[in-house]
Each structure stands twice: as structure tokens, then as C-alpha cells.
Amino acid sequence: MNQRLVYVVSDSGGETAELVVKAAASQFYASPVQVKRVPYVEDKTTLAEVVALAKMNQAIIAFTLVVPEMREFLLTEAAREGVVAYDIIGPLIEKMSDLFQLKPRYEPGQVRVLDEDYFKKIEAIEFAVKYDDGRDPRGILRADIVLIGVSRTSKTPLSQYLAHKRLKVANVPIVPEVEPPEQLFQVGPSKCFGLKISPDKLLSIRRERLKSLGLNDQAIYANMDRIKEELAYFDGVVKKIGCDVIDVTNKAVEETASIIMKKLKR
């Protein structure tokens, strides 16, 4: 069987149309179809040239053009030249618009935009896991945001929440016996946020944490004198850095995240 040609025309990359064409071609033994992709078409001149080529080569045109004017031009030009042109995405857009009572944006490349956004989120989530709890201080200088605070100030959940907003977050625990990593004093203060909490609230949280682990809630970890020592040390560190401090005593993670994002936009 002679190989036949299909021109895949798109105002984006053309991957969607090519996959559909290849899926259809796979239904024929030996798949006697050659696909030529014509991506990122923005003008009618290019469409007319493709129609002329399709006529000359007795080819089919399969296309994904989201702008109605471009779709109509291609269909009209193809019909005039006796070329078969198949609209892959247009009818579905119109059906969805009618059924859902929504107006399409008619903007090319939106799948690619969504894919990029998705991968940015995944990258940020992986970053937050990798640089959680001061595991690797090298992440401090690579982060969009650096969170610091004593234990149980919601650093990890806040890091994950911000990661879902496509922000790369590293967090560092502040402990009197451990010298803060030098990178903490090299990062710009505008990227660093200290998480402050009242001693009473922190005591309550830590005691509940110990109970949930089946441990004695009178351990040094949940001792008021120890907590005050940690918070005093924290105050010294954030003062040295010169970063903003947010009181998270009675704030939900979402509320704290909102404050941070607003400060970043300044």
C-alpha cells in the first residue's frame, strides 16, 4: 500500500493533533501514513501554503486551531481546493461551550501552560521535602523563601502549603545547642521569615505532641524554662539576620502563608 501523507497543523506545538492522527493510522495494517507537523501557525498565509501542499500531494490536513477565524479560513480554503481538512479540537470546544454555558478563551498553547504550571508545582514540592528541617543548608541560597523557627512552629506544613503555590521553600530549625548554618546569614533578609509563637501556646503544642507519641509530657522538650530559652535564642538569630518575624500563635497555616506572599510582592 502506498504511503499517504497527513499534514498536522496547529497554533501550538501540534502534539495533540499528531497523537490523534497516529492513533487513527494505527488502525490500518502497516500504518501507511506519514505525518508532517506544521506547528505554531499564526497567519493565514501559512494555512494557504499548507492547503496548496496538501492538494499537490493528495494529502489530508488534520488541525488544532483554537481561534475561530483561523479555523474557518482553513476549512474554507481547503474546501475551495478540494482538500480534506479535519478539525480535531474546534467542534469539541463549541460543544463544551454550549453545554457548560462558558465562553472559551480561544488562546493557543494553554495545555502547554498548564503542563508547565504543574511541573513547577511538583518541583517546588520536591524542593520543600529535600530541604525540610535544615537537612541540607545548600537549599537556603536556592530557595524563594526561607522559614526559621523553634520546633513546632508549623515550618513543615507551611513549607508544603507554599510549595503548592509554586514557591521553593527551605526551613531551618533554631536550637540553642546548634549553630545556625552560615547560609542563613548570606541569604537576603527579604526572603527569610522568622516564625514566632507565645511560650504558653508552644508548651501546649509540645505537650500534645509528646502525648501523641506516647511519651512523658514532662520531658525537657515541653519545659517552660527550656521553651523560653529557645525563644530567646530565636530572637537573637532573627535580629542578626534582620528578617521579618510573623507571630503564628493563633494563625492557621493558610493565614501565615498569605502574609508571607503579600510581603514577597512588596
From Swiss-Prot:
Its EC number is 2.7.11.32, 2.7.4.27. The keyword Kinase applies. It catalyses: N(tele)-phospho-L-histidyl/L-threonyl-[pyruvate, phosphate dikinase] + ADP = N(tele)-phospho-L-histidyl/O-phospho-L-threonyl-[pyruvate, phosphate dikinase] + AMP + H(+); N(tele)-phospho-L-histidyl/O-phospho-L-threonyl-[pyruvate, phosphate dikinase] + phosphate + H(+) = N(tele)-phospho-L-histidyl/L-threonyl-[pyruvate, phosphate dikinase] + diphosphate. GO terms for molecular function: ADP binding; ATP binding; phosphotransferase activity, phosphate group as acceptor; protein serine/threonine kinase activity. Coiled coil: none annotated. ADP binds at residues 149-156. It comes from the Bacteria. It is an enzyme of class 2 (transferase). Keywords: Kinase, Nucleotide-binding, Serine/threonine-protein kinase, Transferase. The keyword Protease does not apply. It holds the Pfam family Kinase-PPPase. InterPro entries: Kinase-pyrophosphorylase (IPR005177), PPDK_reg (IPR026565). HAMAP family: PDRP. Bifunctional serine/threonine kinase and phosphorylase involved in the regulation of the pyruvate, phosphate dikinase (PPDK) by catalyzing its phosphorylation/dephosphorylation. Belongs to the pyruvate, phosphate/water dikinase regulatory protein family. PDRP subfamily. This is Putative pyruvate, phosphate dikinase regulatory protein.
